[in-house]
């Protein structure tokens, strides 16, 4: 059995754990039961993730005896805007959530960025749990506290810094990830290695076949190593005033190409 791993983010403003493994929500039943007891729970996801993985999600939390509310957005970058954000905030208001309740972001980077921003704004901050379902969101966007929506062509121009209470990087959700999306996440892993760790980069190059086959042990290792590298940067530069800007390597041209 593949060993589960965890990493702790410990910055000046916050402390939280990133849990890495398979079927984590089921394994962490006692922990979730403790923090979610007597709380309302809102799960926000997109239609694609819902169709492919929501049954898995519900199966893993079935022992919790919770009745979560569900809000779905359309998949893709076009949902990352102020109008969709307002719909999420209006929905939470209608459900009469308060800041002691929990919002769960269940999806890739678009869902994570949007829901994190909504959580930071709703009643000046509601409890947030990240359950990223893509390799890119597991190794990068779910960790570090950046939240955002786009403002027209200006990518990520409306946002805050707001951290989750816990992040579950569950490799079981990567089974149905399309190849293109998997490669997008692997590109982020390569970038992290290029910038911060030449030995990790060498490991990636030497193990490309195993990585492309999505070998479980290899996936666990590269997610763990990438988050270890990112966590060190986030802890030392939480609001991107210095070294954290190195994580933006490639973003200038990348965002321009995505937009135009």
Predicted regions and their residues:
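Phosphate-handling active-site elements
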Residues: 94-100, 122-130, 260
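Short glycine-rich anion-binding loops that position phosphate/pyrophosphate groups of nucleotides
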Residues: 47-49, 108-111
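Short glycine/serine/threonine-rich phosphate/pyrophosphate-binding segments
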Residues: 110-117, 138, 255-256
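Active-site segments that bind and position negatively charged phosphate/pyrophosphate groups
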Residues: 202, 207-260
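Glycine-rich beta-strand-to-loop/alpha-helix junction loops that act as flexible
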Residues: 75-76, 106-108, 249-250
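ATP/NTP phosphate-donor binding region
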Residues: 1-102
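A glycine/threonine-rich phosphate-anchoring loop and its flanking beta-alpha core
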Residues: 10, 19, 117-210
């Amino acid at each position: 059995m593949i060993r589960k791993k965890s990493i702790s983010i410990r910055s000046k403003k916050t402390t939280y754990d990133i849990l890495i493994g398979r079927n984590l929500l089921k394994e962490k039943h006692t922990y979730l039961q403790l923090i979610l007891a007597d709380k309302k729970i809102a799960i926000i996801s997109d239609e694609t993730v819902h169709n492919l993985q929501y049954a898995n999600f519900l199966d893993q939390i079935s022992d919790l005896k919770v009745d979560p509310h569900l809000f779905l957005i359309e998949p893709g970058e076009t949902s990352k805007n102020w109008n969709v954000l307002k719909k999420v905030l209006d929905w939470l208001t209608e459900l009469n959530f308060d800041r002691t309740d929990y919002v769960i972001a269940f999806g890739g980077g678009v869902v994570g960025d949007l829901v994190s921003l909504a959580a930071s704004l709703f009643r000046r901050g509601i409890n947030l749990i990240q359950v990223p379902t893509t390799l890119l969101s597991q190794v990068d966007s779910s960790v570090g506290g950046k939240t955002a929506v786009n403002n027209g062509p200006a990518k990520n121009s409306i946002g805050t810094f707001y951290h989750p209470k816990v992040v579950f990087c569950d490799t079981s959700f990567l089974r149905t990830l399309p190849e293109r999306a998997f490669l997008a996440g692997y590109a982020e892993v390569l970038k992290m290695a290029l910038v911060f760790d030449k030995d990790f980069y060498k490991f990636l190059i030497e193990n490309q076949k195993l990585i492309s086959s999505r070998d479980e042990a290899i996936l666990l290792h590269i997610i763990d190593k990438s988050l270890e590298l990112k966590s060190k940067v986030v802890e030392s530069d939480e609001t991107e005033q210095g070294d954290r800007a190195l994580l933006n390597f490639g973003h200038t041209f990348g965002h321009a190409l995505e937009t135009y």
